A protein has these predicted regions:
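Short acidic, glycine/serine/threonine-rich loops at helix termini
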Residues: 74-79, 122-125, 222-224, 247-253, ...
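Helix-loop-helix module between adjacent transmembrane segments
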Residues: 207-209, 243-250
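Thiamine diphosphate
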Residues: 246-274, 489-497
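Helix-loop-helix junctions that connect adjacent transmembrane helices in secondary transporters/permeases
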Residues: 147-229, 394-475, 604, 681-693, ...
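C-terminal catalytic domains of large/alpha subunits in multi-subunit enzymes
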Residues: 67-68, 230-235, 264-272, 300, ...
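Glycine-rich loop/linker segments at domain edges
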Residues: 6, 12-18, 85-88, 156-200, ...
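Short, aliphatic-rich beta-strand segments
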Residues: 35, 209-213, 475-480, 633-635
């Protein structure tokens, strides 16, 4: 019996539903002191003086530390595997606290008190003297001569620049009869809005620092804490229990280094830091706002002669994940619609906004909005159905990327497009809605494709480890460094392990928490990598454990290993399937045999030197109220080729979650900042327009299963892709309904009113 491919219940569902699941805050020592951070209320300034005497004198305050008290060990925060090559290491530009304020919310002091209320009161007693500096919020203005400089090491505020050149762009655009289509596209700064705010607590044990934290990347956080404190990494232990979502925000070391340092300054006493929602909004990480400029030179039949992309990514105040986001988005441009003559450039620049980091999609939602909006602009210029255009130009089967050398093994783009078009009746509806509409309610349909890599090879290391232990009752314990953050990977790993070893699903226990003292190494949850990369480690370890079990069965039965098999937790004879013994019987004998006691375990590391393309598309149907300037999404469908589905119900849930995120990206979500001060204006769940359940349309997920040949279980990326294509599909549906092209999201009523007025569709 194979468990891969079955919709088994989540292994953590009962504990979470019953409230038994223990998160970092639930595990916090009741004696722990509370630390609250003083965030600067300036966009750009030097801290000249901090007077904390009143705060220190308050009852219940244990200590106050300022930016002048902390060690000057610069460290990176991005959750990437360590590189032994200095040029590939993340930028180390952070201190525990800083005297150079680079955004409104930067950390300049911390109060440690016996309780949270006292700590908050003490913060209000701290007086700060600033030397104000000019600031810049716009990414292109930050690159202009004379703009305020944020980091001496990066002249012109440019953190990174990359380019792609293929063919001869200038020669190609001279071809007679070409149609030039040009557009500028903007995506906003948004926040992850995971349920659980970031929190951590730290203490000392045996001269070592222990941090219990809500993180996606425990093994990487250990290294970063060591760097920040200037101590050997082995002197740090990180424990990751259940966590309530992350979406990339927790793929940075956020406050773990500061929390760890505080316990070292307070005699090893436990100290906790828990972010308020307002802090999470603008003091953690945000999604990069990216401005894109695209020019396509198109033949009348829809084929491209030449294409150009320029994009500018707003990094905010610190490097975090840096230029990788813009570079990944740029690299998708020549792949999704191959063209022989390409010029691409991407820049990432510092501004005085909150640091931008990883967020679900890692640059692809921004690139997909710009790229897919542009494709519909091209189809409109050609007077061609957008589906027909994409049929002509989408990445073909057998395509090999010139740079990564990854190969597209399937014709998934077309399979997904056709499945979605048929299910939504797209071609008929598009033609119907394209006819002139004059009423106050107008309808339209739109579509968008996406492309996504699985993991980070060959840009960075991809490896994963797994340990399996045969317990005396015949059950299997599985440990891996890959992290469950709410997406369901523990369930998927249990299904994989059951198949790899040959035991029932119910007898597999995946240890959900990670502890860097005992858990095998894994990079963690990011890049939609865990099912693919972790699957290699589970398959390799499972095969090794199975081999050792059958070797011991050979000892007990005196039968050749080649005649034995392990099926559903039973040792059977291959020729006739006769059950020889239960695995529990073998395990007990192995543990307690006076003649040959064996603790049957297996551990293996898999280094992955392959990558897999995931493909898909979104189809949207909208209703536009021309009088109220409101968009109502009537139907949204995502179609995915994510390889073989390990658990179809979990896959569907992933898609629905991503579609919800894409809806907000399209219609409502945007962090706003005061242009005169740099202060965030809507850093809370009341003013930040996160969509509610009532705002969601009918959402559907379709899958075109196509087993990935490089994967031991046929899997590839699904975690992030569902968020990539809904926004441009909705934008394109509005174009179909109204004839008006919107080149920025979110498409709010205010934006609709302004554009409709410019187009002469509404009166004052």
């Amino acid at each position: 019996m194979s468990y891969v491919g079955r919709s088994v219940p989540r292994v953590d569902a009962r504990d979470k539903a019953a409230g038994r699941a223990m998160y970092a805050a639930d595990l916090c020592d009741r004696r722990a002191l509370t630390a609250k951070i003083l965030h600067a209320e300036q966009a750009h300034a030097l801290v000249k003086r901090i007077d904390a005497e009143k705060a220190r004198a308050m009852d219940g305050v244990e200590a106050v530390f300022t930016c002048f008290d902390v060690p000057k060990n610069y460290f990176p925060t991005a959750g990437h595997p360590w590189s032994t090559e200095p040029e590939h290491q993340d930028v180390a530009d952070r201190l525990l606290l800083t005297d150079h304020v680079r955004f409104w919310g930067d950390e300049i002091a911390v109060v440690v008190a016996q309780d949270e209320l006292t700590a908050q009161k003490a913060l209000r007693e701290i007086e700060v003297e600033y030397e104000l500096l000019p600031f810049v919020l716009d990414v292109q203005k930050a690159m202009e001569p004379g703009a305020p400089q944020l980091h001496e090491a990066f002249p012109g505020n440019v953190l990174g620049h990359s380019s792609v050149r293929m063919g001869d762009y200038e020669a190609a655009i001279k071809e007679p009869g070409l149609i030039k289509v040009e557009g500028w596209y903007d995506t906003p700064t948004v926040q992850h809005c995971h349920i659980e705010n970031h929190n951590c607590w730290a203490y000392m044990e045996g001269g070592r620092v222990v941090v219990v934290t809500s993180t996606q990347i425990p093994h990487i956080v250990r290294r970063i804490v060591g760097q920040a404190l200037g101590i050997p990494w082995g002197q740090v232990r990180i424990i990751k229990p259940y966590i309530g979502g992350g979406f990339g925000n927790k793929q940075d070391a956020l406050y773990e280094p500061l929390c760890a340092w505080l316990t070292t300054q307070l005699g090893g006493r436990p100290v906790r830091i828990e972010c308020a929602r307002e802090e999470t909004f603008h003091c953690n990480r945000v999604r990069h706002a990216i401005r894109s400029h695209i020019i396509s030179w198109v033949r009348p039949d829809g084929s491209f002669a030449a294409r150009k992309l320029e994009c500018w990514s707003n990094q905010g105040a610190y490097a975090s994940h840096g230029h990788g986001i813009a570079a990944k988005g740029m690299n998708s441009f020549p792949q999704i619609y191959p063209c022989p003559n390409i010029e691409c450039d991407s820049w990432t620049a510092f501004t005085n906004l909150p640091p931008a980091g990883a967020m679900r999609g890692y640059g692809i939602p921004q690139a997909t909005f710009a790229g897919e909006a542009h494709i519909d602009d091209v189809s409109k210029a050609l007077n061609m159905n957008p589906l027909e255009l994409r049929r002509k130009i989408a990445m073909p089967k057998g395509y090999k990327d010139e740079f990564s050398k990854n190969v597209n093994w399937s014709d998934s783009f077309r399979a997904c497009m056709e499945a979605g078009a048929k299910a939504t009746d797209f071609e008929r509806l598009y033609a119907e809605y394209a006819k002139p509409q004059t009423g106050s309610i107008r309808r339209g349909v739109g579509m968008a494709l996406y492309w996504y890599n699985t993991g980070v090879w060959p840009i960075s290391l991809e490896s994963s480890s797994c340990r399996m232990v045969l317990d005396q009752d015949g059950s299997i314990q599985v440990q891996t460094g890959e992290t469950e953050i709410g997406q369901g990977c523990d369930t998927v790993y249990a299904q994989m392990a059951a198949d790899a070893v040959g035991v029932p699903f119910g007898s597999v226990h995946v240890v959900s928490s990670q502890d860097t003292d005992v858990t095998p190494y894994g990079s963690g949850a990011y890049a939609s990598r865990q099912t693919y990369v972790g699957g290699f480690a589970i398959a390799k370890t499972g095969a090794l454990l199975r081999e050792r079990i059958l070797d011991y069965a050979h000892k007990l039965t005196r039968m050749p290993v080649s005649n034995l098999d392990l099926v559903e937790g039973r040792i059977v004879r291959k020729p006739d399937g006769e059950v020889l013994m239960d695995l529990a019987e073998l395990a007990t004998e192995a543990l307690y045999s006076m003649e040959d006691s064996r603790h049957i375990t297996a551990e293996a590391t898999a280094q992955i030197k392959s990558n897999a393309y995931s493909f898909g598309c979104a189809y949207a149907e909208v209703e536009v109220d021309m009088k109220l300037c409101k968009v109502k999404v009537l139907r949204l469908m995502n179609v995915h080729d994510c390889g073989k589905l390990v658990n179809p119900k979990l896959a569907e849930a992933q898609v629905h979650g991503g579609m919800s995120m894409g809806l907000g990206y399209a219609l409502s979500e945007k962090l706003l900042f005061d242009e005169k001060t740099g202060r965030p204006l809507n850093a809370n769940l009341l003013d930040y327009k996160l969509l509610t359940f009532m705002d969601h349309p009918r959402m559907e997920a379709l899958f075109c299963e196509n087993a990935e040949p490089t994967s031991p279980f046929g899997t590839k990326a699904l975690g992030e892709p569902p968020a990539c294509s809904p926004a441009p599909a909705i934008r394109n549906a509005i174009l179909n309904a109204t004839g008006v092209a919107f080149d920025a999201c979110p498409i709010t009523p205010h934006v609709l009113y302004r554009r409709f007025k410019e187009a002469g569709l509404i009166d004052e």
